[in-house]
Amino acid sequence: MAEKRNIFLVGPMGAGKSTIGRQLAQQLNMDFIDSDAVIEERTGADISWIFDLEGEDGFRKREERIINELTQMQGIVLSTGGGAVLSKENRNYLSARGIVIYLETTVEKQFQRTQRDKKRPLLQDAENPRQVLEDLAKIRNPLYEEIADITLPTDEQNAKIMVNQIVDLIDNMNGLNGAL
């Protein structure tokens, strides 16, 4: 059997990276890793607290080290934080070490999905969260597109359908009947 390639999920907060990633990993019999969860586990603090204490720059440095480490593993489905693509190094690690799937969503759908989530540091204290999401999209969406091998809109699909689409697309990319 061919060596399994890593699958890296990128996209904005609320796109469904963690939900889809878990199901995708299960279907492909791969390990699922969420880079934000690894950062929280290693620091013993949640992302919001790290942002408060170290600022976004401090968090991004931690994130870069973790993504460098995780992308060197084999046979994983990795869900990245929405801002991981801001680092050129992260974009290089992701695009060189696996298949990058951009889970695309609209600002409106993001707003609906993140409205009650208190673990989104960039939205927590925002007077106008929708505007923050629009501003982030302007900066980040071109970076997601830059490194994506596959782009999939997530607004109208449920996770199971998305997972099946991803598996089919990867199979077609590889030309291997189901082997990653």
From Swiss-Prot:
Functional description taken from the UniProt entry: Catalyzes the specific phosphorylation of the 3-hydroxyl group of shikimic acid using ATP as a cosubstrate.
Localization, UniProt: Cytoplasm
Cofactor annotation remark: Binds 1 Mg(2+) ion per subunit.
Highest classification ranks of the organism: Bacteria, Pseudomonadati, Pseudomonadota, Gammaproteobacteria, Pasteurellales
Amino-acid positions noted as binding Mg(2+) in the UniProt annotation, renumbered to this chain: 18
Organism: Haemophilus influenzae (strain ATCC 51907 / DSM 11121 / KW20 / Rd)
CC cofactor: Mg(2+)
Primary localization class, coarse: cytoplasm
Protein name per Swiss-Prot or TrEMBL: Shikimate kinase
Positions contributing to ATP binding: 14-19, 120, 157
Gene Ontology biological-process annotations: amino acid biosynthetic process; aromatic amino acid family biosynthetic process; chorismate biosynthetic process
